[in-house]
Amino acid sequence: MTIESTNSFVVPSDTKLIDVTPLGSTKLFQPIKVGNNVLPQRIAYVPTTRFRASKDHIPSDLQLNYYNARSQYPGTLIITEATFASERGGIDLHVPGIYNDAQAKSWKKINEAIHGNGSFSSVQLWYLGRVANAKDLKDSGLPLIAPSAVYWDENSEKLAKEAGNELRALTEEEIDHIVEVEYPNAAKHALEAGFDYVEIHGAHGYLLDQFLNLASNKRTDKYGCGSIENRARLLLRVVDKLIEVVGANRLALRLSPWASFQGMEIEGEEIHSYILQQLQQRADNGQQLAYISLVEPRVTGIYDVSLKDQQGRSNEFAYKIWKGNFIRAGNYTYDAPEFKTLINDLKNDRSIIGFSRFFTSNPDLVEKLKLGKPLNYYNREEFYKYYNYGYNSYDESEKQVIGKPLA
């Protein structure tokens, strides 16, 4: 397998540039221990869905080149992308999975490249729930499932009914299967693939977050009834089960307290304080997670939030409860070139800063931040295409190139 040189990524000449003040002398480039590993700097690539796997969910040669390029600076933590934990968890074309041997073998080749660069890897386990594609699931004989039969918008209801795959609530037996079989199977394959960490996606309106949120959880059993303890029960069960599988020091969790993405209501401090208290109790008993990835209130899903709408929202409550590491992510470039917010947030010695959108257009982002080189602005129009154009290359011929499975 040939891996492309990082020098082959040339953006269009009219790409907007963002000026950067050199950050090499800041805490951003000081080491931090994450689980059993010491990262020599505090920059993480946080997950970006890009649809470049093969159509049957096997990581591709395009992804190998992509992650190799973004792990070139030693010690970078690469959290690959949202990755299906099971077939029932989602079946969108060209999204990678980590639930079978072929997928694990392909991810292993990507991890070998990341580790060969002296960097680290984490996989984000994804379960879509009510925002999955009803027709694609129907075509594979799979149900559209959620905490409750509450669609996230009118169009999703229309499409589900047209597909003959209407949304229904998970049974308690199905929930047990998700906890005891589906997530552990994905986590075991992640270990076989060589990932350093396994991150549970508990944010942005996907299945585990749907249980947390009153807009999507109308259950009347032990997973609902409006109580915080019940709504957080599934998430904490998944955490506890995966601690058994991968070990706490290799396990992580992503949360988005202020997101209102995909029909969700803002959850805020209350339920997330409870979750963090529960995780801290586990840490106090020797089961501390590697990190918690927390989305800043500057972002909700794929959208930036105005300064006006951010008022009264802060993640400071979380840093007072959880004493372990945080990955803090969400539009840290908004005050470039000075990056005052980033520098201030690093005063908390347990913080790593996550970037995603600007990593898509700057494979050498870490070096640019260190040396103060301008950043290429990202091209959102090419985020969710299947071809290589806008991913590893801006050569027009790459619009004909689709990823080939690595295994």
From Swiss-Prot:
| Catalytic reaction annotation | A + NADPH + H(+) = AH2 + NADP(+)
InterPro entries for the chain: Aldolase_TIM (IPR013785), OxRdtase_FMN_N (IPR001155), Oye-like (IPR045247)
What cofactor is needed?
A: FMN
Catalytic positions? Y206
Annotated site residue numbers, May interact with the steroid: C225
Q: Which SUPFAM superfamilies match?
A: FMN-linked oxidoreductases
Q: What is its EC number?
A: 1.6.99.1
Q: Which UniProt keywords apply?
A: Flavoprotein, FMN, NADP, Oxidoreductase
Q: What does this protein do?
A: Oxidoreductase that binds mammalian estrogens with high affinity.
Which family does the record claim for this protein?
A: Belongs to the NADH:flavin oxidoreductase/NADH oxidase family.
What is the protein name for this chain? Probable NADPH dehydrogenase
Q: Which organism is it from?
A: Candida albicans (Yeast)
What lineage is this protein's organism placed in?
Answer: Eukaryota, Fungi, Dikarya, Ascomycota, Saccharomycotina
